[in-house]
Amino acid sequence: MKKTFFTKDPSFYRSFFKLMTVIALQNLVAYSVNMLDNIMLGSYSQNALSGAATVNQIYFIVNQIALAIGNALIAISSQYWGSHQTKPIRKVTKAALLFSLAIAAGIIALCIRIPNTLIGLFTTSPDIIREGTTYLHIIQWTFLFFMISNLLLAMLRSVETVKIAFLISVISLLVNGGINYILIFGRFGAPEMGIRGAAIGTFAARILELGIVLFYVWKKDTKVKLFDEKFRDGIIGKGSGTVWKTFFKVCIPILTSGLLWAVSLPMQTAILGHLSADAIAANSVSSTFFQYLKVIVIAIAGASAVVIGKDIGSNGEEKVRCNGRTLSVLYLAIGLLLGTVLFLLRSPLLSMYRLTPQATLYADHFMIIMSVIMVGMSYQMPVGVGIIQGGGDTKFSMYLNLISVWCIVMPLSFLAAFYWKLPVELVVIAVQSDQIFKCLPIFLRFKSYKWIHKLTAID
């Protein structure tokens, strides 16, 4: 193709923005499901809310594992989609499913054998542990359903089928919210079940999600046709070595990176939790609005991984470079827009809360900081995860996260909070600093184009 700095292909923009919009809506609905659970349990009982929150720490780890395996599947499958091959997609999807099932089984076994020990990692309160154990007893089975659903939806996303995921998220929100309302509070003649009712609502929603996605993949999907052959074909026996080697080569670095980040979050929360009560309240409020805008950034990264992988699979390296440059500039523009929105809306948003004057001042300062952080995150996350990792270079992201989070951010945050005892605004900057300084190494790696890795070795 003729060398140009930015792509002029309208189909590229249509594909990218379609994927981004649907993924963003799906993520927004999924985030709202968690918010709804917290609101309902919070209005029922503080111990119930805290018990569910501790179990959600375990679910967060499961979620990160599922996302990592799904991202690995997308990185590989999108390249085959670009080269119009679907048989290898079926093989690598089945490998990812088997790996996910093994991990889910291991986590569920731990939840059955040592539930109190697991929950005790996050709290020492006997009342909260009791509520959390009740919740975990039901929720643990949803880990399996969630991992299967997530993998099948990742497979569909890799071939640019995304609307079904949004539909499932909406149905899940309605079902979960409805059952929660009835069973938590005992409405319409149902027994008042408290935290058990919330767990049953989540269980029912996850079962329904899995049922819908299985039906869609089996009966409606005309692209991959996952069930057109025996499940063992290609992943057990002759020729299966290449499938597993390719999958683990991509998956292990992504999984390691995700787990390193997931483990760091509770530690960052603990650092912020040692600040004053006003600072903790301010951080909670500002983080809520920040997370809603972050949903858009995550969607951008997800859409980018699909379009870049598809371009690599079609053997158009110059096209990959051109589209990558176009996307990187789009990221900056979107980041500036999101940062400006957060900055301008901070006063109207804060007016909805009843905070102390000091907490309001802190929240205002935090949202100004988050406005700048948003610009950096809107660039580094989509380039790092969407383009570089989506292009097959998974080890770079792993090493970058290892160094930035564990060698810089965590020590810096600890020193800022406990040794130097800096103002709370500077502590928040330290905790979020990787969103800014990762931009430089990510930009340099992107400009080298060494992230373009061909992953299509499966027959």
Residue ranges and their predicted role:
Residues M1-I23, S77-L144, P191-C251, I308-M374, ...:
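Short alpha-helical transmembrane segments in multi-pass integral membrane proteins
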Residues K18-D37, I138, S149, S172, ...:
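Transmembrane helical elements of multi-pass membrane transporters/channels
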Residues L28, S32-S50, I119-P126, I182-M193, ...:
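Helix-terminus/linker motif at the lipid-water interface of multi-pass membrane proteins
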Residues A30, N34-D37, L41, N63-G70, ...:
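Alpha-helical transmembrane segments and their lipid-water interface positions
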Residues L41-F60, P126-E131, I195-R196, T242-V250, ...:
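Interfacial/gating helices of multi-pass transporter permease domains
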Residues L49-A109, F146-A165, T269, I280-R346, ...:
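Small-residue-rich hydrophobic transmembrane alpha-helices
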Residues G70, I139-S158, A165-N176, A198-L214, ...:
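Short runs within selected transmembrane alpha-helices of multi-pass transporters and secretion channels
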